[in-house]
Amino acid sequence: MTNGKIWLVVKPTVGVPLFLSAAVIASVVIHAAVLTTTTWLPAYYQGSAAVAAE
């Protein structure tokens, strides 16, 4: 393991859940930002028909 020394500073019982929680929070924030700033993604999730390009 390349970064094995991190577990000398942080216990795995603390570090692993902390890392996984950070990944989940980042994912939710990114998905929320994309859903609120785009118009096509919510429509795609709702299953509406695609608009033909002009």
From Swiss-Prot:
<keyword id="KW-0479">Metal-binding</keyword>
<protein>
    <recommendedName>
        <fullName>Light-harvesting protein B-800/850 alpha chain</fullName>
    </recommendedName>
</protein>
<keyword id="KW-0460">Magnesium</keyword>
<comment type="subunit">
    <text>The core complex is formed by different alpha and beta chains, binding bacteriochlorophyll molecules, and arranged most probably in tetrameric structures disposed around the reaction center. The non-pigmented gamma chains may constitute additional components.</text>
</comment>
<dbReference type="Pfam" id="PF00556">
    <property type="entry name" value="LHC"/>
</dbReference>
<keyword id="KW-0997">Cell inner membrane</keyword>
<comment type="function">
    <text>Antenna complexes are light-harvesting systems, which transfer the excitation energy to the reaction centers.</text>
</comment>
<dbReference type="InterPro" id="IPR035889">
    <property type="entry name" value="Light-harvesting_complex"/>
</dbReference>
<dbReference type="InterPro" id="IPR000066">
    <property type="entry name" value="Antenna_a/b"/>
</dbReference>
<keyword id="KW-0042">Antenna complex</keyword>
<dbReference type="InterPro" id="IPR018332">
    <property type="entry name" value="Antenna_alpha"/>
</dbReference>
<dbReference type="GO" id="GO:0005886">
    <property type="term" value="C:plasma membrane"/>
</dbReference>
<dbReference type="GO" id="GO:0019866">
    <property type="term" value="C:organelle inner membrane"/>
</dbReference>
<keyword id="KW-1133">Transmembrane helix</keyword>
<dbReference type="GO" id="GO:0019684">
    <property type="term" value="P:photosynthesis, light reaction"/>
</dbReference>
<feature type="transmembrane region" description="Helical">
    <location>
        <begin position="15"/>
        <end position="35"/>
    </location>
</feature>
<keyword id="KW-0157">Chromophore</keyword>
<keyword id="KW-1003">Cell membrane</keyword>
<dbReference type="GO" id="GO:0045156">
    <property type="term" value="F:electron transporter, transferring electrons within the cyclic electron transport pathway of photosynthesis activity"/>
</dbReference>
<dbReference type="InterPro" id="IPR002361">
    <property type="entry name" value="Antenna_alpha_CS"/>
</dbReference>
<feature type="topological domain" description="Cytoplasmic">
    <location>
        <begin position="1"/>
        <end position="14"/>
    </location>
</feature>
<keyword id="KW-0437">Light-harvesting polypeptide</keyword>
<keyword id="KW-0148">Chlorophyll</keyword>
<comment type="similarity">
    <text>Belongs to the antenna complex alpha subunit family.</text>
</comment>
<feature type="binding site" description="axial binding residue">
    <location>
        <position position="31"/>
    </location>
    <ligand>
        <name>a bacteriochlorophyll</name>
    </ligand>
</feature>
<dbReference type="GO" id="GO:0030077">
    <property type="term" value="C:plasma membrane light-harvesting complex"/>
</dbReference>
<keyword id="KW-0472">Membrane</keyword>
<dbReference type="GO" id="GO:0042314">
    <property type="term" value="F:bacteriochlorophyll binding"/>
</dbReference>
<keyword id="KW-0076">Bacteriochlorophyll</keyword>
<feature type="topological domain" description="Periplasmic">
    <location>
        <begin position="36"/>
        <end position="54"/>
    </location>
</feature>
<dbReference type="GO" id="GO:0046872">
    <property type="term" value="F:metal ion binding"/>
</dbReference>
<keyword id="KW-0812">Transmembrane</keyword>
